[in-house]
Amino acid sequence: MEKANETSPVMGFVLLRLSAHPELEKTFFVLILLMYLVILLGNGVLILVTILDSRLHTPMYFFLGNLSFLDICFTTSSVPLVLDSFLTPQETISFSACAVQMALSFAMAGTECLLLSMMAFDRYVAICNPLRYSVIMSKAAYMPMAASSWAIGGAASVVHTSLAIQLPFCGDNVINHFTCEILAVLKLACADISINVISMEVTNVIFLGVPVLFISFSYVFIITTILRIPSAEGRKKVFSTCSAHLTVVIVFYGTLFFMYGKPKSKDSMGADKEDLSDKLIPLFYGVVTPMLNPIIYSLRNKDVKAAVRRLLRPKGFTQ
């Protein structure tokens, strides 16, 4: 295991991966490669149909196209490096490349948190205030909503990455992770990281707490409105328009809260299990969730399935 001199600055990092579990690495390589291909194909198809099919030129599918593009960017910022790490005995990464990866991953994660809350608002207006939907969710409204999600996520990423790269790293240069995950990198700093911790807590409130509360309140009103519909068929039809989004929210935020909110183990055996889970949970969040998103939206949405069929038919969008 490489260590930098205790007084010399770290010029690069070593990614530790699953070195304690070498028997799993080939299996994980194949699984992650297959999932990455599904992510590219599934999200790529969703982006195509939301652009090419005029029937899907609505706020909901505009947000969905943004989410699909974001998932491709998010996984591409880390998965190729993860795959490469399985093929090399010891994966090293330069300080600057690590900073770029931290920035991209953080920006994509923050943007997705806000995008999901914007999508919840879209569903709230569509179900609870349908007569004013076209006025409230006009193009002049939903495009700035999406743009602000990207801008705020990017700004937060710049702040956190800037704070992280200004820290001195003069000791252990081994990142106990697949990628340059910001929390794993901060553990290697040989200086006080109080500012980083405080800023991270503030960010957690902005990107986790506030969106979850907003989404929760939106769905309280949505479910209340659905329950007032007299027919069971009517309730089922209306709920189907937001069930895919609700499923994605539960998977996405459930993984995030488990990753950042779970208690830490104190005994050595528990620490070993925690060490493995600290790698597998972000892997699930960074690969499995983006893979599930297009599957969930295509299985739960008749419009998307019909658009995909039209895409596969010659001249399907010309009719």
Curated annotation (Swiss-Prot):
Answer whether the UniProt record assigns the keyword Lipoprotein to this protein: no
Q: Between which residues do disulfide bridges form?
A: 98-190
Q: Which residues form a coiled coil?
A: none
Keywords, alphabetical: Cell membrane, Disulfide bond, G-protein coupled receptor, Glycoprotein, Membrane, Olfaction, Receptor, Sensory transduction, Transducer, Transmembrane, Transmembrane helix
Xref: InterPro entries: GPCR_Rhodpsn, GPCR_Rhodpsn_7TM, Olfact_rcpt
Topological domains on the Extracellular side lie at: 1-26, 81-101, 160-196, 261-279
Give GO BP annotations, semicolon-separated. Answer: detection of chemical stimulus involved in sensory perception of smell; sensory perception of smell
Spans through the membrane: 27-50, 59-80, 102-121, 141-159, 197-220, 238-260, 280-299
> What's its membrane topology?
Multi-pass membrane protein
Segments in the Cytoplasmic topological domain: 51-58, 122-140, 221-237, 300-319
Q: Which GO terms describe its cellular component?
A: membrane; plasma membrane
* Major location (coarse): membrane
Where in or outside the cell? Cell membrane
Looking up PROSITE patterns in the UniProt record yields: G_PROTEIN_RECEP_F1_1, G_PROTEIN_RECEP_F1_2
PANTHER family xrefs: OLFACTORY RECEPTOR
Described function: Odorant receptor.
Q: Which family does it belong to?
A: Belongs to the G-protein coupled receptor 1 family.
This chain belongs to which protein, by name? Olfactory receptor 2S2
**Source organism of this protein record:** Homo sapiens (Human)
Lineage, highest ranks first = Eukaryota, Metazoa, Chordata, Craniata, Vertebrata
Gene name of the encoded protein: OR2S2
